[in-house]
Amino acid sequence: MPRRAILACLFSLLALGLTGRTVDASPGDDSLSFLYTASKNYEPLAWMHGAERFSSGATVFVLDVHGQHALVADFAASADPAVSFDGQRLLFAGKQSAQDSWQVWEIALAGGKPLRITSCPEDCIRPLYLPEDRIVYARKVGGHFLVESAPLSGGKPLPLTYGPANALPTDVLRDGRILFESEFASESQTVPEIYTVYSDGSGVESYRCDHGKVRHSAKQSGSGDIILVSDGGLARFTSARAQQLPISAPAGEYAGDIAETPQGSWLLSWRSDADSKFQLMFWTPGAANLHPVLANAGLNLIQPVLLVQRPIPNRHPSGLHDWPNANLLCLNAYTSKQSFAAGSIRSVRLYTRDDTGEARLLGTAPVEEDGSFFVQVTNEQPLQVELLDAAGRTLKREAGYFWMRRGEQRVCVGCHAGPETAPENAVPMTLLKSTTPADMTGKTAQSAAGGH
C-alpha cells in the first residue's frame, strides 16, 4: 500500500485540533484510515490481576484523509476501538467523566452521539462485534474480568467464561469462535495464554498446548494464522504446526493487536525498548525494516484498527441441550503431554472451587484399561481433573481450571493431548460397559461408578 496517503494525513495533523467530525472509511488501496489509542501509561497485562491498563487515561483517535481528531472529544477517556463488519459503526470502551467506570459504547461513522451499550457497576472493556447484532466484551465482577456477550439492543448478557482466571477477548475468528487471553497456571508459574470459546460459552480450549511462554494480544490475519505477542516479540499459530512459530521481525518490543491492510502489510505498535513509548509503524512481513507512521514522545500509540469493511464471521448454532448438567467423555487419558505407564491410570477425580477459592471434591470415577471415562459434571463452575493410580496416589492434577456449559456434551481425545492429536478409530471401553455417565455433579463426594 502506498505510504503517500499516510504521510499526507500526518502533515495535516499540525493544523488540526481535537474536534468532532464525520469519519471517512477507507474507500480503497490509495488511502489508509484508521483508529488508534493514545495513553501515557500502558500496561498490557494489567488485566491478569484485574487492574487498569491505562493508569493515566487514554483517548481513541481517528486518522483519515482529513487529518486526526479524537473519536469522542468530550469523553474523559476512551480505548479499545472496534469497527463493525460493514465498516459503518464503532464500538469502544469509554468514560464520560473521570470517576465513571468503563462502559461499552457505540457510535456511527456518519456522525451523531455515542450510545451506551452496557451499564456495569464495575468496568466493561474490550468490546468486539459478533454476528447477528451481538457483541462480546470483558466485564469486571468483584475485581475479576470475565468474558460475556450481549445483544446490541440491550438485554440479558450471557457469561462465556466461568473459571477463576481473568479473561479478555481479543478477536472474533472467521469460524465464529471468540479468541481471548487468560491465565495459564502450571506448577511453577502463571502466564498469559491464548484461548478460544464458542459464542455460547462451550468448547473452551487453549489454542496451542506448548505452554510456558508469555502470549497475549492475538489477532487473526488474512491467512488464518493467529498473530500474537510472545515474550515481547511477534509469533504466530498456523494450522500446519502444533507449536508456536516465531516471526522474524525487526528488533524491538511489540504491543500486538496488529491491523492488516488489504494488501497484507501490517500496521502495528512498536518500541525500541522498555523505556521508550510505543509508536505506530508500517511493516510488510519479511521486510528488513519498519516504516514510521505516527509517534508521540510522551504517549504510547497502540490498538490500531483499520476503517474498512470485513467479512462477517460464521454464525455458531449452539449444540447445548436442555439438561441440568453436562457430560464429558475422555477417549484415552494416556493420550497426553504427560507420560503415563500402561495400566497406571485407574481413576479420575473432579474438583471445583468453593466460595473461598479452595478446591472442593465433586467425585471419583473409574478409568478403563484403554484410558476412557465418561462422567456427568456440574455446569458453569470451575472444573479441575486429577488422575490417580490403583493406590489412590496422584499421577497428574491440573493446575488450572476449565468449565462446561449447561447441557454441553464434550468429547476429549485425551488429557491435555494437544490440537495435533486425533483419536483412535475404536469405541471406548467405558461406553461398551455403559452409556450412563458417572455422576460427578457434587451431590456426594463418594466414588461414582456410573453404569459399572
Model-derived features: positions:
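Bacterial N-terminal signal peptides that target proteins for export
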Residues: 1-9
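Low-complexity intrinsically disordered segments
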Residues: 3, 16-19
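Positively charged, low-complexity intrinsically disordered regions
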Residues: 4-5, 22, 447
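Bacterial N-terminal signal peptides
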Residues: 8-17
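Sequence signature of WD/YWTD-type beta-propeller architectures
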Residues: 23-370, 376-382, 393-414, 419-431, ...
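Long, low-complexity, intrinsically disordered segments
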Residues: 449-452
